Amino acid sequence: LPRLQADAERHEWPPRWLMGQLREQTVLVVGLGGIGREVARLLAAFGTCVIGTSRRGEPVDGVSELVHPSDLADVVGRVDGIVVTLPATAATEKLVSAEVLDAVRPGATLVNVGRGSVIDEDALVTALREGRVGFAALDVFAKEPLDPASPLWDLPNVIISPHNATLTPAEGR
């Protein structure tokens, strides 16, 4: 999306490029509560290989492999995308740490629709600048609203939304 937006701003029609297909991807869903289970189900419906984190190890429809949250650094190098859906707790604070982000497969996509405190934002900025994380879609942040001085605003490989992922038409009324 950032690439397409940049081309549009320059009024350029770029040559076509090969895009990855969901059925060719492996995605790690960090947190298999209600939202995480639904994300896993939808990804699996498209043929995506889904790995999920679980402290209890209970099977989840659509999830082909379960890992403990403490093993994130061991698994992120095998995935193309990471979707974080965890709540903010003492146990989840900065769970996606510098160590985890250092181990990410170069160019991986990171989506956070859980809580901002789950990701070490400073480490994420570094990972985005270095290309370890190729793209991030962030709906939540450690402190909201996101500080206007945050470097996340200026990174071309980041899309920011204002904690809008859970807003439904009923809530908007």
What are these regions (language model features)?
Residues L1-T26, R41:
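Phosphate-binding beta-alpha-beta segment of Rossmann-like dinucleotide-binding domains, i.e.
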Residues T26, T48-C49:
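Residues at the starts of beta-strands that form the adenosine-phosphate
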Residues L32-G33:
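Glycine-rich Rossmann-fold phosphate-binding loop(s) that bind the pyrophosphate
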Residues G36-R37:
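N-terminal Rossmann-fold NAD(P) dinucleotide-binding loop
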Residues A40, A44, L128-R129:
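Gly/Ala-rich phosphate-binding loop of Rossmann-like dinucleotide-binding domains
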Residues S54:
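Conserved acidic E/D residue at the C-terminus of a beta-strand in Rossmann-like folds
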Residues G57-P151:
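Rossmann-like adenosine-cofactor binding region
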Residues E144-R173:
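C-terminal helix-to-coil terminal segments
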